[in-house]
Amino acid sequence: MKRTYQPHNTRRKRTHGFRARMKTKNGRKVINARRRKGRKRLAV
């Protein structure tokens, strides 16, 4: 049986990266929430 997680850096950046987050309103919400929380890493 094939596992669901097949790591791939390009896809990782494209779907969860900073620029991807900034593209949508909700993504910006995520970044701001993480800023408020004081996360060391805002995005992948």
Swiss-Prot record:
Keyword entries, A-Z: Ribonucleoprotein, Ribosomal protein
PROSITE patterns recorded: RIBOSOMAL_L34
Intrachain S-S bonds: none
Keyword Hydrolase annotated: no
One term under GO cellular component: ribonucleoprotein complex
Gene3D superfamilies xref list: 1.10.287.3980
Record GO biological process: translation
Coiled-coil stretches: none
InterPro entries attached to this UniProt entry: Ribosomal_bL34 (IPR000271), Ribosomal_bL34_CS (IPR020939)
Alphabetized Pfam families for the sequence: Ribosomal_L34
Region (Disordered): 25-44
HAMAP family xrefs: Ribosomal_bL34
Similarity annotation: Belongs to the bacterial ribosomal protein bL34 family.
Protein name: Large ribosomal subunit protein bL34
